[in-house]
Amino acid sequence: RNVKGDILNGRVRSTNFGIWWDGDLLRELLDHERVLKYDWKAGRTYTLMQLKNCKFNNGTKSNPCLSADILGDWREEILTRDEASSELRLYVSTIPTTHRITCLEEDIPYRLGVAAENSGYNQPPETGFYFGAESKF
């Protein structure tokens, strides 16, 4: 709905995890072993990556073990377990980016969010600064 209460699109979208994945400055959606891109112009989502042979946690919510800027290129990686829970897997975007941004772990609110995600409240970390499509980095 918009600010007037008008319905903009009647289809329900994923609202599970946001993740910086594909190289632009918009967040993608991480939900049930898939990274999804929301095309706001077309009003639909499409799959960027299907994570194979892995398991997420908490059945209905489907949380990864961790999603964060682990490797330091500002885009976030996905840490999960395999189906047998015998190994950890780190999924990394292979999509090129032209943006050069400081490692998100250097931002204190982001780092605290990663610690909270990893130790209790499993929600994606947020930066302490505005990070969006029109940002100039």
Regions found by a protein language model. Name each.
Residues 1-137:
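Beta-propeller-forming repeat regions
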